[in-house]
């Protein structure tokens, strides 16, 4: 599913860049932002599901990645049969720390750019104003760097977890300047 979302994001970004109608352009950019962040979340869920079968991680790490509630009862770790959603940022940090050991959260530009996109997504999802005040150039900038950064991080994780990169058609979305 994450692949479809990445392609959808690129599709909407291209549509946004080709229209002269500001309202329509913002509509497409918002859709692209949602699709990009949904792609990241879907990818993390996919990785978590695969790792839950692989017995590579500790049970509490798998529970965390797969949004399972866990507890310590009587000094014993237990995975409960309940959902408990965990922050995307925390899941990414866990996976990156495990599978991309040389990744620097402070120095890798893709990390801050991805979370700049997430911040925009959160602003759209939980608006504090009546009107979308983000201008077209800002949408374009944040989405262009955010989509590219999402793909870069996902590709690095794919190489670390699966020992192979993302498909070329996805990698090409980050290098073409269609947006």
Where are these regions (language model features)?
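Amphipathic alpha-helices that form helix-helix packing interfaces
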Residues: 9, 16, 32, 39-43, ...
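Charged alpha-helical initiation segments
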Residues: 1-34, 175-179
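Terminal, compositionally biased low-complexity regions
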Residues: 3, 23, 52-55, 70-81, ...
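Long amphipathic alpha-helical segments
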Residues: 53, 133-134, 155-179
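Flexible secondary-structure boundary motifs
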Residues: 55-127, 131, 149-163
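Short, hydrophobic, well-ordered secondary-structure elements
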Residues: 26-51
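Hydrophobic packing residues in well-ordered alpha-helices of helical domains and bundles
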Residues: 25, 29-33, 114-117, 139-143
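Terminal alpha-helical segments
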Residues: 1-17, 47, 51-55, 59, ...
